[in-house]
Regions:
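N-terminal, intrinsically disordered, polar/charged segments of Gram-positive cell-envelope systems
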Residues: 9-65, 198-213
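Compositionally biased, intrinsically disordered low-complexity regions enriched in proline and serine
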Residues: 47, 55-59, 70-73, 118, ...
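N-terminal secretory signal peptides
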Residues: 62-78
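Conserved polar/disulfide-associated segments of primarily extracytoplasmic proteins
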Residues: 75-211
Length: 214
């Protein structure tokens, strides 16, 4: 792992999910209209896409994944997702997750209304996470949140309020784990949390009125 330290708004008008964007906690398996009760979708189509560099200014982090690791993602062997504490409360944590998908999970189609997404997500095997946690959060709590057993502290956020961690599962497949450990991470200036509370939109989304807007 290479580590160095350098100093959006969700649409309320539509529950539609665009291919290539992660599903927010508000959207996971949920549909507000009765007519959507039986709506189904393929979760693997909505994992985060590979990029040359990921810049999360509300987390105060940017990182680059290895080319081989990105190939695993492009081949749908690894799902990149996100998670954060409730957006209507004080931010306690926010992180990106990296998970192994089986062939069955890659092909799976789930029902939005019946908690299908949560069941699918919980069935994935966690490789590791990158994110921030409120200062003085115990490693025991971080382990519970991230589903990881090994935590490397990258540093402290620029506002001094959060600890930044790179977390992994020590017993995971060595080839995938070693590639994940090649991730290059930097701490950058952390922007103030947006009014809508969602901190997992990237730099390219910041000028838009909603995250992931095309």
């Amino acid at each position: 792992m290479s580590l160095s330290t350098v100093g959006c708004k969700k649409s309320n008008e539509s529950n539609k999910i665009k291919e290539g964007q992660s599903i927010s906690s508000k959207e996971k398996g949920m549909s507000t209209k009765e007519k959507d009760k039986n709506e189904t979708f393929k979760p693997s189509d909505y994992t985060l896409k590979t990029k040359k560099e990921y810049v999360y200014e509300y987390l105060g982090l940017k990182f680059k994944l290895s080319n081989k690791f990105k190939k695993y993602m492009n081949d749908k062997k690894i799902a990149m997702l996100d998670d954060q504490s409730p957006i209507d409360k004080e931010l306690k944590y926010a992180f990106l997750t990296f998970n192994k998908m089986t062939k069955e999970q890659k092909k799976a189609v789930v029902n939005k209304k019946e908690g299908g997404y949560e069941k699918w997500e919980n069935g994935l095997k966690r490789i590791g996470t990158i994110g921030i946690f409120e200062k003085n959060t115990s490693e025991e709590k971080i382990s519970k949140l991230t589903k990881c057993d090994t935590h490397t502290k990258i540093g402290v956020s620029s506002d001094g309020k959060y600890d930044c961690y790179f977390s992994t599962n020590s017993g995971f497949e060595i080839n995938l784990l070693n590639e994940f450990k090649k991730t290059e991470i930097q701490i950058i200036e952390k922007k103030e949390r947006p009014k809508n509370g969602f901190v997992l939109s990237e730099k390219t989304d910041l000028e838009n009125t909603e995250a992931f807007k095309k």
